């Protein structure tokens, strides 16, 4: 889908660049495939802020998206493509041959009327699901499982994909968008194709108010705060913080490694950080 620009009737319209969503379905979602969703304003179950600068925003209905695709060898027809306010990608409503409906992540080049299917050995075409071990080397995939039967976790954002680059016994080697190469079990499934809406990276929000509609509040820098509020706060006049950048809790930021999951290090063949050196 193309990008859409607007006449400069206001400063916000002048800067605004949006994705043209005119080809998407304009009605309401299927009710049985939706749930109510409470806005938590960045607070956790104890009421403490866990994500700063969240709050407000338009009310959203959660669409239940099927990331597992466990209905094997039953063809499904794509009924329509829809906008989903809870994610950057578009979603597709599919209807199985037995009448059941489901939402899936819409891959690029998936059109209304196409047929998709999940199975051990299926055609390599967008929207079909099969185990990674049965795919040819070089296949572009998304919604990749990391644990057998858990459902897709990797490459679910707009325009993202991973690529199958090799095999190693029961495992396959997958290259991610970040440059990381990783071992994933061959029985883990993935959906063929890249995720829809690749132009999402090119949009321009246009004005502060549109960011508020998305549920983000103004982001305050530490150097404009008082010393009680942030390690960079205080000083007479404008200062640069006087130290290497830290979080509000005094931990180094801007590049310090925070990964602590050592048990899965053996599955990472090439780190995403190695690529940048």
From Swiss-Prot:
A biological process from GO: cytoplasmic translation
UniProt xrefs under PROSITE patterns: RIBOSOMAL_L2 (PS00467)
Record keyword Phosphoprotein present: no
Molecular functions (GO terms): rRNA binding; structural constituent of ribosome; transferase activity
Record Pfam families: Ribosomal_L2, Ribosomal_L2_C
Key words, A-Z: Ribonucleoprotein, Ribosomal protein, RNA-binding, rRNA-binding
Entries under InterPro entries matching the protein: NA-bd_OB-fold (IPR012340), Rib_uL2_dom2 (IPR014722), Ribosomal_uL2 (IPR002171), Ribosomal_uL2_bac/org-type (IPR005880), Ribosomal_uL2_C (IPR022669), Ribosomal_uL2_CS (IPR022671), Ribosomal_uL2_dom3 (IPR014726), Ribosomal_uL2_RNA-bd_dom (IPR022666)
UniProt region (Disordered), positions on chain: 226-277
Assigned GO CC terms: large ribosomal subunit
HAMAP family associated with the record: Ribosomal_uL2_B
Chain's role: One of the primary rRNA binding proteins. Required for association of the 30S and 50S subunits to form the 70S ribosome, for tRNA binding and peptide bond formation. It has been suggested to have peptidyltransferase activity; this is somewhat controversial. Makes several contacts with the 16S rRNA in the 70S ribosome.
Record's subunit section: Part of the 50S ribosomal subunit. Forms a bridge to the 30S subunit in the 70S ribosome.
Family classification: Belongs to the universal ribosomal protein uL2 family.
Name this polypeptide is given: Large ribosomal subunit protein uL2
Protein source organism: Rhodopseudomonas palustris (strain BisA53)
């Amino acid at each position: 889908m193309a990008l859409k620009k607007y006449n400069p009737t206001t400063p916000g319209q002048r800067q605004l660049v949006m994705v043209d969503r005119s080809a998407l379905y304009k009605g309401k979602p299927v009710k049985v495939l939706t749930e109510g969703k409470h806005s938590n304003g960045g607070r956790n179950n104890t009421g403490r802020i866990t994500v700063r600068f969240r709050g407000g925003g338009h009310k959203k209905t959660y669409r239940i998206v099927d990331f597992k695709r466990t209905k094997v060898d039953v063809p499904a027809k794509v009924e329509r493509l829809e906008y989903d306010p809870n994610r950057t990608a578009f979603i597709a409503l599919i209807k199985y041959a037995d009448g059941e409906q489901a939402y899936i992540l819409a891959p690029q080049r998936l059109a209304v009327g196409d047929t998709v299917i999940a199975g051990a050995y299926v055609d390599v075409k967008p929207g079909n699901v099969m185990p990674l071990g049965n795919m040819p080397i070089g296949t572009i995939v998304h919604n990749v499982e990391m644990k057998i039967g858990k459902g897709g976790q990797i490459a679910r954002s707009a325009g993202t994909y991973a690529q199958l680059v090799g095999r190693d016994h029961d495992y396959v080697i997958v290259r991610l968008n970040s440059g990381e190469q990783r071992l994933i079990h061959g029985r883990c499934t993935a959906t063929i194709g890249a995720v829809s809406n690749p132009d999402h990276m090119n949009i321009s929000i246009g004005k502060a108010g549109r960011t508020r509609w998305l549920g983000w509040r103004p982001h305050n820098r530490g150097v404009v705060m008082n010393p009680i509020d942030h390690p960079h706060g205080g000083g007479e006049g404008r200062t640069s913080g006087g130290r290497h950048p830290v979080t509000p809790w005094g931990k180094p930021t801007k590049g310090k490694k925070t990964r602590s999951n050592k048990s899965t290090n053996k599955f990472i063949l090439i780190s995403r950080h190695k690529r940048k050196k």
